């Protein structure tokens, strides 16, 4: 490496003996050499190189390979199709027929997680073509062959997801998809196992209970050292929104406890903060939440809903449970509006939505989710959740005052003040 580095920096080739103990019999002058080195690797590897050879790295011309393509018009989509055909010809594999392209594009957008982005990775393209070619009888991959390949892949890689679903269906993990419950909500999470090629989603039951106390919000996951830092941050943001909205002049007279039920591993991320906030509001207002609806998304301190990852897996995980138990037409999921562009759902789920058997609601603010879950507005005219919570706070404060001072002392205090 030292000799190669000298050749690159000096742009000359020196004749040296392979054996340092035996020099060349004659001295040969160095020769001019036009040499370039192309280093290809991930950012972590390039960072190591930059640390080891800062002078050489400073002279390098840096560039990046794009592994995805954003298509906004027909020309870009046509260029991507040509790229797929080029890979098929190089590998001597059949290319997609006209009816196979929509399925391949759907799979591509699902892989990238964006409806307007397709993968450029030759490895990804090769895998799709090779697996589909096994079900192809002609010179082109038909839509039927592509569909068969995708279905077989889901079946091959779906064992763990099916076992987790069985735990819920056999009521070993308690998830309700009908009825109402105070302080309980179905959140959505993504499960990834090392060495397993497919992530899958499943609902998680979040519960919240409140009682008279000093205003503490207890994060059970954090107390049990099962909650990560990002989850803790989401909890604090959620609390800040609620305290700001209630406009309290004194400390909240309730203590609340929030937890992921039947969760025995570390929980991290803020994608459940909107669900936790809804459960907290339900418990404070003593208003039940519709268990037919699951929810995912994070919130900021102003109650605005922010996008999260793993959306397709989350929705499909809850849909599968509802489907196995029987679709009622009232079940669905609430997602951030910013996540709509990331939807790339299975054909079965899309058909259920089209038949009004399952619903997907996209929202921008937490106040849009609360009426769907509790049948009450957060704020406005008539009976609202905010008003209900404030009334319960006032009642709790009065009870606390009565317990603190016996009635004769209260009477004396009232007389002296007059």
Map each language-model feature to its residues.
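Ordered, soluble secondary-structure elements with a strong preference for glycine-centered loop motifs
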Residues: 40-43, 50, 70-78, 94-98, ...
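Conserved C-terminal "switch" segment of AAA+ ATPases
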Residues: 50-51, 57-58, 62-123, 138-140, ...
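Short hinge/gating elements
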Residues: 42, 61-72, 82-92, 109-118, ...
């Amino acid at each position: 490496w030292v000799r190669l580095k000298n050749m690159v920096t000096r742009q000359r080739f020196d004749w040296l003996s392979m054996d340092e103990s035996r020099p060349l019999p004659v001295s040969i002058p160095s020769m001019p050499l036009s040499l370039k080195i192309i280093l290809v690797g991930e950012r972590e590897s390039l960072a190591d190189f930059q640390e080891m050879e800062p002078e050489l790295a400073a002279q390098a011309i840096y560039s990046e390979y794009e592994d995805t393509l954003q298509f906004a018009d027909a020309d870009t989509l046509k260029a991507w199709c040509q790229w797929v055909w080029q890979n098929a010809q190089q590998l001597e594999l059949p290319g997609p027929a006209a009816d196979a392209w929509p399925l391949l594009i759907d799979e591509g957008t699902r892989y990238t997680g964006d409806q307007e982005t397709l993968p450029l990775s030759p490895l990804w393209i090769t895998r799709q073509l090779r697996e589909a070619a096994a079900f192809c009888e002609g010179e082109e991959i038909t839509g039927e062959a592509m569909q068969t390949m995708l279905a077989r892949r889901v079946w091959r890689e779906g064992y763990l997801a099916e076992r987790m679903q069985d735990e819920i269906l056999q009521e070993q993990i308690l998830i309700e998809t009908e009825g109402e419950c105070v302080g309980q909500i179905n959140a959505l999470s993504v499960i990834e196992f090392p060495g397993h090629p497919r992530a899958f989603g499943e609902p998680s039951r979040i519960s919240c209970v409140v009682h008279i106390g000093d205003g503490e919000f207890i994060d059970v996951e954090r107390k049990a050292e099962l909650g990560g830092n990002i989850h803790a941050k989401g909890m604090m943001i959620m609390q800040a929104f609620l305290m700001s909205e209630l406009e309290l002049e004194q400390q909240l007279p309730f203590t609340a406890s929030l937890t992921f039920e039947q969760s025995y591993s570390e929980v991290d991320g803020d994608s459940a903060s909107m669900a936790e906030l809804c459960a907290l509001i339900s418990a404070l207002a003593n208003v039940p939440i519709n268990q037919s609806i699951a929810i995912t998304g994070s919130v900021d301190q102003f109650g605005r809903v922010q996008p999260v990852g793993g959306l397709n897996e989350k929705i499909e995980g809850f849909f599968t449970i509802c489907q196995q138990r029987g679709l009622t037409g009232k079940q669905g999921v609430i997602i951030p509006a910013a996540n709509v562009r990331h939807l790339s759902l299975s054909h079965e789920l899309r058909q259920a939505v089209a038949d009004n058997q399952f619903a997907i609601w996209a929202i921008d603010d937490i106040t849009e989710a609360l009426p769907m879950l509790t049948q009450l507005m957060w704020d406005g005219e008539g009976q609202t959740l905010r008003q209900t919570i404030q009334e319960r706070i006032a009642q709790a404060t009065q009870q606390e005052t009565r317990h603190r001072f016996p009635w004769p002392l209260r009477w004396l205090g009232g007389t002296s003040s007059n």
